[in-house]
């Protein structure tokens, strides 16, 4: 695909920005187009009412290419880092479909203000029996807060709130390979944790692309299954970058109890459930041992499926002496 005049005008300005604010960005148009060819988003997002939300949009190159391929009615760049905002101010004035919402993407209220008060983004509501075909989210979560935010986004998918209140909204998210590796850790692999289980519960997630230097960090079965685009390790591309495609799915699990049990069990994930069940609360052993399948009790938490966790959570929900549920959220004031 040839470079448009808009992209040609953006590239030199974007490449002059020498800070990434702790994030990593793929800025090679050839690689970005190769990834978008694999995703084939054009075959699904055909509506003239399409809206795109770009979270931590950064140096604009991917955003321009995505915009020109999908031609959305509105493309909101949620970004408040100074050098990137200055880039948008210098380049977007002749491209009305692309607007910068200059507020902090890390703050929950930013998204409420964007959709409810300022109405910069106004997605349609769609039923939860298909992937939303008029709303797409892209995000770059490669900074130090990235994995924490990724977990929060998964919770929002599972809880059907935040941007996911509009329906099952596909997300394209850049993350470090360390986070991606956890997402695709198979049963009985010690990389499995709460992130893995939450992803399996609420989404169908695919590995779309990963850096050449990161390939060996994934199990061969994962690479064979997804056949990701391999980003070459050269001076044009970061060496620790993975892109995942998150396709939310509906579920009927009681997430409060499930999440509490998952968090607790993963603290001692290398011990059999029957040996560490007291971590759910004082007296748990007396309640759970006779009510759970003996086969399940002998498993270690990293060997469990999200449905097996749900079996434990259902017994937990009936426990008269269960502790109060404490839900962890990210700290908006964290540095």
From Swiss-Prot:
Protein keywords: DNA-binding, Methyltransferase, Mitochondrion, RNA-binding, S-adenosyl-L-methionine, Transcription, Transcription regulation, Transferase
Short name of any one Pfam family annotated for the protein: RrnaAD
Binding positions (S-adenosyl-L-methionine): 79
GO molecular function: DNA binding; methyltransferase activity; mitochondrial transcription factor activity; RNA binding
Top class in the EC scheme: transferase
Keyword Mitochondrion attributed: yes
Record's keyword annotation contains GTP-binding: no
Family (UniProt): Belongs to the class I-like SAM-binding methyltransferase superfamily. rRNA adenine N(6)-methyltransferase family.
Protein name: Mitochondrial transcription factor 1
Organism: Kluyveromyces lactis (strain ATCC 8585 / CBS 2359 / DSM 70799 / NBRC 1267 / NRRL Y-1140 / WM37) (Yeast)
């Amino acid at each position: 695909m040839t470079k448009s005049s808009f992209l040609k005008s953006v590239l030199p300005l974007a490449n002059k920005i020498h800070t990434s604010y702790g994030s990593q960005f793929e800025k090679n148009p050839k690689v970005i187009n190769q990834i978008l060819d694999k995703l084939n988003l054009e075959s699904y997002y055909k509506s003239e009412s399409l809206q795109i939300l770009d979270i931590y949009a950064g140096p604009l190159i991917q955003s321009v290419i995505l915009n020109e391929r999908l031609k959305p009615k509105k493309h909101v760049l949620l970004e408040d880092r100074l050098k990137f905002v200055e880039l948008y101010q210098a380049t977007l004035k002749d491209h009305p479909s692309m607007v910068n919402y200059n507020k902090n993407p890390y703050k929950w209220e930013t998204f409420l203000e964007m959709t409810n008060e300022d109405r910069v983004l106004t997605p349609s509501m769609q039923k939860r029996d298909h992937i939303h075909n008029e709303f797409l989210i892209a995000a770059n979560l490669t900074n130090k807060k990235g994995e924490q935010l990724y977990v929060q986004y998964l919770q929002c998918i599972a809880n059907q709130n935040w941007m996911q209140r509009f329906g099952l909204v596909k997300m394209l998210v850049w993350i470090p390979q360390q986070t991606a590796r956890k997402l695709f850790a198979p049963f009985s692999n010690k990389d499995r944790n709460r992130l893995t289980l939450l992803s399996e519960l609420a989404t169908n997630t695919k590995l779309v692309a990963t850096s050449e230097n990161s390939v060996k960090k994934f199990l061969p079965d994962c690479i064979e299954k997804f056949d990701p685009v391999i980003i070459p390790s050269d001076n044009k591309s970061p060496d620790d970058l993975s892109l995942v495609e998150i396709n939310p799915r509906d579920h009927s699990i009681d997430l409060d109890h499930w999440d509490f049990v998952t968090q607790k069990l993963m603290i001692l994930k290398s011990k059999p459930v029957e040996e560490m069940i007291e971590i759910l609360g004082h007296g748990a052993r007396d309640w759970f041992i006779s009510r759970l399948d003996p086969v399940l009790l002998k498993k270690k938490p990293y060997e469990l499926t999200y449905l097996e966790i749900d079996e434990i959570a259902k017994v937990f929900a009936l426990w008269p002496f269960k502790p109060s549920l404490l839900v962890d959220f990210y700290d908006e004031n964290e540095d």
